[in-house]
Amino acid sequence: MAVDSVFWEGASIAFRQILLPIQAVLFLILLIAVSVWDISKRTIPDGLQVGIAALSLLQFQPQHLLGILTAVPYLAVALCCQNGKGIGGGDVKLAGSLGLVLGLSGGLFASVIGLTGFVLSGMGFQMYRRYRKKEEQAPLPLGPFLAVGAAVIYFMQVGGMVL
């Protein structure tokens, strides 16, 4: 009986070690796809978000289900700013799917990193426009910034940093 449990535990660890690089590569590919799509079309397809959420199954941890709560602040902002100039539903769903992979604390840290980059870039673009005396306002996509934050936190977690 004890030999069986040791065998299955060892097999589970070996299987997880095989799945981790697969998850990492697919996660990066999907994050790049989200970024490119959001920059070019100003929308994030549901299929990419479902793909990211499905990746959480490769290294499933029940506590990561709470990560979906990382979408709540984005949902609140989206509901408050419904004039078409706020964040969109794609950003809300992206935050939730990233939270499923990263967990609640990882998802929140990824959001902080992504939003910090977003705000600093927005300020930089605004200063550039004022310096060049340009009046047009181009919307800045949030998806690429969330993707960078998620990649940073993901590899911090893989590297052993507990968040």
What are these regions (language model features)?
Residues 1-163:
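A membrane-topology feature that recognizes alpha-helical transmembrane segments
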